[in-house]
Amino acid sequence: MAIELLYDADADLSIIQGRKVAVIGYGSQGHAHAQCLRDSGVEVVIGLREGSKSSEKAQEAGFEVKSNADAAAWADVIMLLAPDTSQAEIFSHDIEPNLKDGDALLFGHGLNIHFELIKPAVNITVGMVAPKGPGHLVRRQFVDGKGVPCLIAVAQDPKGEGKDLALSYAAAIGGARAGVIPTTFREETETDLFGEQVVLCGGLEHLMMKGFEVLAEAGYAPEMAYFEVLHEMKLIVDLIWEGGIENMNYSISETAELGGYVAGPRIITPEVKENMKAVLADIQSGKFVRDMVADVEAGQPELKRYREEIAAHPIEATGSKLRDLMSWVKNPLDETA
């Protein structure tokens, strides 16, 4: 089924220009949304919790910073860009008591609405504007007169304005310059979680670690194992990102290309595909999110345990040592330590 693509000519920028927008959160996406909205002639304030380290950054950028509750009371469009695990609490404590008839509540990701962790009143427009790129890219492309493609969706539309409002907002952050794709909260949420868990984060992470273990256990130097299964990953991913799998195969040696064809199906077997389907089923049923919420309520012991296990894996110590040799590689964790 062909997707619908919408552009600036399809959007009415005056819709969002006529609203007062509170951006809740000033992280990667929050700073980009706020600055692009302001440059597009939209009245914007930033909502942050008391004591947030982002307050100074937002004020230095020229924004008025309010508490989450005061920002919600002031605005008639609220974009909630806090972390997924914080959104339900922010909504119930700060936003919900301050919602007014006709307000719109927007999200950058559909998880909390799709899995009903947040349930706005029926008189509230609920939509999503999700750029398919990190905030710094959204901002840079906007400044350059371009844009990052956006997904939009509507979950509640009491006034029949949801799609037009979401499209107007997407245009104001540059998305309609590149293309805006209407979708649903369900589709965005479930495919996003699946991609993260099966390929981008969980799958890739464990593929690299297992490859490292096989080489190290076979007697090869850990440094060589790191180079071959992790360091060179960026080279390959960049080729795929730029031109697809065909471009990657075109760009590598014939030896590497043939080896990939021969060995790939031995690693990613039909059983692996069945495991992927099982992960998708856990996402669709809500099991993953229920488990995540339970972990958050318990103080995140599971998340902390997983982090400790990864930090203790020898691939991390080996990588840290080797990256010290690479002056062109900067570790963001070093800057926040």
From Swiss-Prot:
Chain residues that bind Mg(2+) 2: D192, E228, E232
Top-level taxon of the source organism: Bacteria
Binding residue positions for NADP(+): Y26, G27, S28, Q29, R49, S52, S54, D84, T85, S86, Q87, G135
Active-site residues annotated for this sequence: H109
Cofactor(s) needed for function: Mg(2+)
Coiled coil location: none
Free-text comment on the cofactor: Binds 2 magnesium ions per subunit.
Keyword Glycosyltransferase: no
EC number annotated for this UniProt entry: 1.1.1.86
InterPro entries documented for this protein: 6-PGluconate_DH-like_C_sf, KARI, KARI_C, KARI_N, KARI_prok, NAD(P)-bd_dom_sf
Pathway as given in its UniProt record: Amino-acid biosynthesis; L-isoleucine biosynthesis; L-isoleucine from 2-oxobutanoate: step 2/4; Amino-acid biosynthesis; L-valine biosynthesis; L-valine from pyruvate: step 2/4
Pfam families attached to this UniProt entry: KARI_C (PF01450), KARI_N (PF07991)
Alphabetical list of Gene3D superfamilies matching this protein: 6.10.240.10, NAD(P)-binding Rossmann-like Domain
Record domain KARI N-terminal Rossmann: where: 3-183
KARI C-terminal knotted domain residues: 184-329
GO cellular component: cytosol
GO terms for biological process, alphabetical: isoleucine biosynthetic process; L-valine biosynthetic process
Residue positions binding substrate: S253
Reactions the enzyme catalyzes: (2R)-2,3-dihydroxy-3-methylbutanoate + NADP(+) = (2S)-2-acetolactate + NADPH + H(+); (2R,3R)-2,3-dihydroxy-3-methylpentanoate + NADP(+) = (S)-2-ethyl-2-hydroxy-3-oxobutanoate + NADPH + H(+)
Gene Ontology MF: a single term: ketol-acid reductoisomerase activity
Binding positions for Mg(2+) 1 per the UniProt entry: D192, E196
Swiss-Prot/TrEMBL keywords: Amino-acid biosynthesis, Branched-chain amino acid biosynthesis, Magnesium, Metal-binding, NADP, Oxidoreductase
Function: Involved in the biosynthesis of branched-chain amino acids (BCAA). Catalyzes an alkyl-migration followed by a ketol-acid reduction of (S)-2-acetolactate (S2AL) to yield (R)-2,3-dihydroxy-isovalerate. In the isomerase reaction, S2AL is rearranged via a Mg-dependent methyl migration to produce 3-hydroxy-3-methyl-2-ketobutyrate (HMKB). In the reductase reaction, this 2-ketoacid undergoes a metal-dependent reduction by NADPH to yield (R)-2,3-dihydroxy-isovalerate.
NCBIfam families xref list: ilvC (TIGR00465), PRK05479.1 (NF004017), PRK13403.1 (NF009940)
Family note: Belongs to the ketol-acid reductoisomerase family.
Name of the protein described by the UniProt record: Ketol-acid reductoisomerase (NADP(+))
Species this protein is from: Corynebacterium diphtheriae (strain ATCC 700971 / NCTC 13129 / Biotype gravis)
UniProt lineage: Bacteria, Bacillati, Actinomycetota, Actinomycetes, Mycobacteriales
